C-alpha cells in the first residue's frame, strides 16, 4: 500500500475513535472502576487529581489517543480488515505486540504488582478491540 491512502482515510472515524479511547480511560480510571487500586499501587495521592496538572494530563491523553487511532487505522487499511471482527483482531494483535509484550516484563523489572499490569493492559485491550472494530467498519 502506498501513501496515497492518506487522502482516503476517514478523519472523523479517527477523531471518534480517539474520543472513545479517551472516554473509556476516564471511566476505567474513575473511582467507579479502578482509580483506588491504580492510585494506591502507583503511590498517587487522590488529591493530585484536583490540581491544574490534571488538565494537561487529560489533554496529552487525548492527543496520544489521536495518534494511536491514526496508526491503528493504518494497520487496518494495510491488513484490509473490513468487518468488526477483523478490525478487533487487528486491535488485539496490536495490543499483544505493542502493549502486553513490552509492558509485562517491564512491570516485573520494576517490581510492580501484576494487578497494575492487568488494570493498564486491560484498558488498552478493551480500547483496541472496540476502536479496531469501529475503524474497520467506518474507515
Task: Describe the function of each predicted region.
Residues 1-139:
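Juxtamembrane/disordered regions of integral membrane proteins
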Amino acid at each position: 500500500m502506498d501513501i496515497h491512502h492518506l487522502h482516503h482515510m476517514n478523519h472523523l472515524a479517527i477523531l471518534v475513535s480517539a474520543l472513545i479511547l479517551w472516554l473509556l480511560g476516564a471511566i476505567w480510571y474513575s473511582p467507579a472502576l479502578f482509580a483506588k487500586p491504580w492510585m494506591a499501587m502507583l503511590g498517587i495521592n487522590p488529591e493530585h487529581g484536583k490540581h491544574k496538572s490534571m488538565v494537561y494530563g487529560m489533554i496529552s491523553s487525548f492527543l496520544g489517543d489521536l495518534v494511536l487511532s491514526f496508526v491503528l487505522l493504518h494497520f487496518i487499511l494495510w491488513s484490509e480488515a473490513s468487518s468488526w471482527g477483523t478490525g478487533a483482531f487487528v486491535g488485539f494483535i496490536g495490543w499483544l505486540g505493542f502493549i502486553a509484550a513490552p509492558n509485562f516484563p517491564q512491570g516485573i523489572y520494576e517490581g510492580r504488582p501484576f494487578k497494575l499490569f492487568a488494570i493498564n493492559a486491560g484498558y488498552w485491550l478493551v480500547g483496541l478491540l472496540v476502536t479496531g472494530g469501529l475503524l474497520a467498519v467506518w474507515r
